[in-house]
């Protein structure tokens, strides 16, 4: 688990994921990039990145892409901010087009194959422009999208080399979205 304690959303997300992993009875190694070195990824099968701003990772973003290509699996659990380092891996994430702005997420449609209770739309109270405006290519499998005319992808996976990226793009990090995060994390495993 990679977090950045200087990013408020990273800290809030860790509070939610700590509970998710406890409920899933899943062990986790936490690396706060502000307090410790980023570990060598070779000893891991999965990495969860709880950062929306990847600039502090610098060239580690490229290392993450190379690690996935060799068979690693990564979940970007927070809506990414378009910047230089994210641009380096956009295509690897399955993104074919992106904007610098975010879009409103007031209703999320969940694919019925993604999780129990899927196949319908969920209203989001206190909605705001929380999702990065992107389009994904045919190689990406989209599991959730905005329930509007734009249908912006909110949860998707994209195989890359021998590995896989999973991206959560809904931008909401609260108790009510733990199920979405847990289901997204399960996409990293071979068995759902």
Model-found features: residue ranges?
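Short, surface-exposed linear patches
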Residues: 22-25, 51-53, 69-73, 97-99, ...
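A general structural signal for short secondary-structure junctions and capping/turn motifs
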Residues: 38, 66, 132-135, 155-159
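A glycine-rich, often tryptophan-bearing local segment used as a flexible ligand/cofactor-contacting loop or short
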Residues: 54-128, 135, 140-141, 145-147, ...
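Extracellular ligand-binding/catalytic regions of CAZymes and related secreted enzymes
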Residues: 1, 12-24, 141, 147-154, ...
